Amino acid sequence: MKTILITGIGGLTPRSIAKIIKEKHPDYKLIGCDVDKKAMGFFMKTKDGRQLIDEYFIAPRCDRPEYFPWLERLVTEKKVDYSFVEPESEIVEWGRYYEVNRKYPCPTFMGCRLLSESLRDKAIMAELLEGTEFIPKTIKVTQKNPRFEDVEKKIEFPCWIRATEGTGGL
């Protein structure tokens, strides 16, 4: 039996990863962690009603100094074989950890740190994808400069306003 850690388990991608692993390898032990104590509340059952995650831990924020010591203890205590790292903010920090330590806390599956740097800020991502078919018309607004006239003329109402980072940026 393998033990797999999935970070950011409250997010859609980590839950999807967990569902596939549970479906293909029901004997694997899945450990989830997230900074949000409510992350385990939604969509955490398999199709046949089993728990998606075997153990759940509330993690320190990945940009805090206590994150990696906490994570290293978890990997050791739970005998984690592999980790799947999400979301982009954690990928960036794990990438930095690797640059300093020349290793990850355990064998790891994750995206590219440099790409994740741009993808975690939805405004930067919109700038990179501007003019392609991969993103709808986009205008950067702020609370200080809401640009209502530009939104009305260029995008039109109704429209969707998103946060550039975090769960509001999903």
Walk through the language-model features, giving the residues of each.
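ATP-binding N-terminal substructure of ATP-dependent carboxylate-amine bond-forming enzymes
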Residues: 1-109
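Short histidine/acidic/glycine/proline-rich micro-motifs that form metal-
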Residues: 62, 88-89, 113-117, 142
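Residue-level detector of family-conserved "landmark" positions at structurally sensitive sites
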Residues: 85, 111, 137-139
